[in-house]
């Protein structure tokens, strides 16, 4: 989940430029996505998340022996190049889809929508990865791992958003 979780902060850090919706409105006369979803953010967020995943793959065999008493080390050495790309890219797609629906509901850019704001990237990462590499996803995200992710991720998400806000990369701390 680390590549997926870090894709969004990297998108915010390196984003800007041309909005994905090109500034266009939907048929409800509201922006399709808003200025916060840009091609540069999508590309660099996905790329940075993928590079973090690659770093995990390279380090896992060296770290696995030290975690033998805590987790099954074999879990750290199985990887998928498809998931390496789909997890961060899917995370950002999940955020984009959520933004589309927030605009339809009348939420402005930066407005808080609890739970959806914390788990949109998880849903996007899992859905895209399930569509393109279901075996890897189901082998790595058992029901208990999925529950742990759903419970733990919101805490990390809020912490990263507060950090982004304090660094001046986010307009709001959520």
Swiss-Prot record:
Membrane topology listed for this record: Multi-pass membrane protein
Cofactor: Mg(2+)
The reaction(s) this protein catalyses: 2,3-bis-O-(geranylgeranyl)-sn-glycerol 1-phosphate + CTP + H(+) = CDP-2,3-bis-O-(geranylgeranyl)-sn-glycerol + diphosphate
Pathway: Membrane lipid metabolism; glycerophospholipid metabolism
Keyword Glycoprotein among UniProt keywords: no
One of the record's GO molecular function terms: CDP-2,3-bis-(O-geranylgeranyl)-sn-glycerol synthase activity
Keyword check for Transferase: yes
Keywords recorded for this protein, A-Z: Cell membrane, Lipid biosynthesis, Lipid metabolism, Magnesium, Membrane, Phospholipid biosynthesis, Phospholipid metabolism, Transferase, Transmembrane, Transmembrane helix
Role: Catalyzes the formation of CDP-2,3-bis-(O-geranylgeranyl)-sn-glycerol (CDP-archaeol) from 2,3-bis-(O-geranylgeranyl)-sn-glycerol 1-phosphate (DGGGP) and CTP. This reaction is the third ether-bond-formation step in the biosynthesis of archaeal membrane lipids.
Protein name, per record: CDP-archaeol synthase
